[in-house]
């Protein structure tokens, strides 16, 4: 065997010359203490606020408190497998989530991972950061398109527009979630149509709710054919506080994908009181100084930075919109508590639900006097404005008179007429759950109420009258309903047709 020394030395020299020391360097630290979903970590010198870190077993966390000698991290998962001395690795990225139409019809957790057992996500467009800045002033446009809820009391007197933030506030068990679900179900007709620019994709965020409640909501949406255009983000009561804090931001990033691509999204935060409680828990465990009601000082910023991301964009930015319906739970109708006042001041109006009304059988239990929509009237269809314009005033007068009428028995004819009309309008605004009405149906029904067609009926017959009237209109006057739907206003011709139809129907109603 011939060994050529020169050749071997040439090969070795070449190997040495081209040798690259490719050592993988990762910034690591070690756990000092862990408990209650919070880990104190020593040694992550270069970590940034809000950056993701990884604990043993693939459990992720987020660095929130950067102190001189340690870093306070919140853990997105079970902290029982983490112990003192464990190695923690920087991931060099901020929390992000999958977005796109592939998420429609799915149930995901607070990090955007599927939890519905239907396999991995398909058709995902991209990944987006969950906490981004809201659009500035220039890309926005004032709200001008209606976002129909299908609920008479809301669409007539507290109208919501696309791009608005309308708070739903009330005690527990007053029907807050029911209003949000009705709104999602009401989009079915639009979403089954061919007009892509009118479609409204819905995202429902369940924060700190029972798993059985979330399962019931999924079932309701599925049975009514609404799950196909809805994404459900669930951080339930058994999930760690960091997941409950993060879920609304994750869902918001999903809605922003639709908004930024010229589409329309509706997002329901159910509810932000529980998100604030989760954030308070995290802040106190991280030893941040407490403020009013033990919430941290930046709890206002927590909600404002989330809700400011709902917007209507102008034509140059694709004309997309994102409408937010945040829900807040009050204690004993106390609207002046810390979180309720914060969110009322951030949003563009509120729908106030009352326990007393609910128990009187007025459902949805909307207190029309305290509820307001600050920008929605610009988005209301002309037809609805024409028929419901005076309704809020009439009901306010009725409530005032009803309070006085309790004391006196002899009332003049005008007062008696006002009380009669008010009782019938209140009865007319009642609506069963999961039965939203289209705009043209609402217009006809409210026209009958405000123009005095119900004044001679017994109050107990009002709801039967409404059901029979709608059946009659669909059967005999389908063209009239179609004309109101396409024109979006009551023309002289359609108004005279409606008057004739109502007069004839009321005469024969028994």
UniProtKB/Swiss-Prot annotation:
Membrane topology term: Peripheral membrane protein
Binding site for ATP: 170-177
InterPro entries hit by this protein: ATP_synth_asu-like_sf, ATP_synth_asu_C, ATP_synth_asu_C_sf, ATP_synth_F1_a_nt-bd_dom, ATP_synth_F1_asu, ATPase_a/bsu_AS, ATPase_F1/V1/A1_a/bsu_N, ATPase_F1/V1/A1_a/bsu_N_sf
Record localization: Cell inner membrane
Domain of life where this protein originates: Bacteria
Database matches in SUPFAM superfamilies: C-terminal domain of alpha and beta subunits of F1 ATP synthase, N-terminal domain of alpha and beta subunits of F1 ATP synthase, P-loop containing nucleoside triphosphate hydrolases
EC numbers: 7.1.2.2
The protein's role, per its UniProt record: Produces ATP from ADP in the presence of a proton gradient across the membrane. The alpha chain is a regulatory subunit.
Name the UniProt record assigns to this protein: ATP synthase subunit alpha
Native species: Maricaulis maris (strain MCS10) (Caulobacter maris)
Organism lineage string: Bacteria, Pseudomonadati, Pseudomonadota, Alphaproteobacteria, Maricaulales
């Amino acid at each position: 065997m011939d060994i050529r020394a020169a050749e071997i030395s040439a090969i070795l020299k070449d190997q040495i010359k081209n040798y690259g020391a490719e050592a993988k360097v990762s910034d690591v630290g070690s756990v000092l203490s862990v408990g209650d979903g919070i880990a104190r970590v020593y040694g992550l010198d270069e970590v940034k606020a809000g950056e993701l870190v990884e604990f043993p077993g693939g459990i992720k966390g987020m660095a929130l408190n950067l102190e001189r000698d340690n870093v306070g991290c919140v853990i997105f998962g079970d902290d029982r497998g983490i112990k003192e001395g464990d190695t923690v690795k920087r991931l060099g990225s901020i929390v992000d989530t999958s977005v796109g139409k592939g998420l429609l019809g799915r149930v995901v957790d607070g990090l955007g991972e599927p939890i519905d057992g239907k396999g991995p996500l398909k058709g995902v467009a991209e990944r987006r950061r969950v906490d981004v800045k809201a659009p500035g002033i220039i890309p926005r446009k004032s709200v001008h398109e209606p976002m129909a809820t299908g609920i008479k009391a809301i669409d007539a007197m507290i109208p919501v527009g696309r791009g608005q933030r309308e708070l739903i506030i009330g005690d527990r068990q007053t029907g807050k979630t029911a209003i949000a679900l009705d709104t999602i179900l009401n989009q079915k007709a639009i979403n089954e149509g061919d007009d892509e620019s009118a479609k409204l994709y819905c995202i429902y965020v369940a924060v700190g709710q029972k798993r059985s409640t979330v399962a019931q909501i999924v079932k309701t949406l599925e049975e009514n054919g609404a799950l196909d255009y809805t994404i459900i983000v669930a951080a339930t009561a058994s999930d760690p506080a960091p997941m409950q804090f993060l879920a609304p931001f994750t869902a918001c990033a999903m809605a922003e994908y639709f908004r930024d691509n010229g589409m329309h999204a509706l997002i329901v935060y159910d509810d932000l009181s529980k998100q604030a409680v989760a954030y308070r828990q995290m802040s106190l465990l991280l030893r941040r100084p407490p403020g009013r009601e033990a919430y941290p000082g930046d709890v206002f910023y927590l909600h404002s930075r989330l809700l400011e991301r709902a917007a209507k964009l102008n034509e140059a930015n694709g004309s997309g919109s994102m409408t937010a319906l945040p829900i807040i739970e009050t204690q004993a109708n106390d609207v002046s508590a810390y979180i309720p006042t914060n969110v009322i001041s951030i949003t563009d109006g509120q729908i106030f639900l009352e326990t007393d009304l609910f128990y009187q059988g007025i459902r949805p239990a909307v207190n029309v006097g305290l509820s307001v929509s600050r920008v929605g009237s610009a988005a209301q269809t002309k037809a609805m404005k024409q028929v419901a314009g005076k309704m809020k005033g009439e009901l306010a007068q009725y409530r005032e008179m009803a309070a006085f009428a309790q004391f006196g028995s002899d009332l003049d004819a005008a007062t008696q007429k006002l009380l009669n009309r008010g009782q019938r309008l209140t009865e007319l605004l009642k609506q069963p759950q999961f039965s939203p009405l289209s705009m043209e149906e609402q217009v006809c029904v409210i026209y009958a109420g405000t123009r005095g067609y119900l004044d001679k009926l017994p109050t107990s017959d009002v709801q039967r009258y409404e059901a029979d009237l709608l059946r009659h209109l669909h059967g005999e006057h389908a063209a009239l309903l179609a004309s109101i739907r396409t024109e979006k206003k009551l023309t002289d011709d359609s108004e005279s047709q409606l008057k004739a139809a109502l007069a004839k129907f009321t005469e024969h109603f028994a």
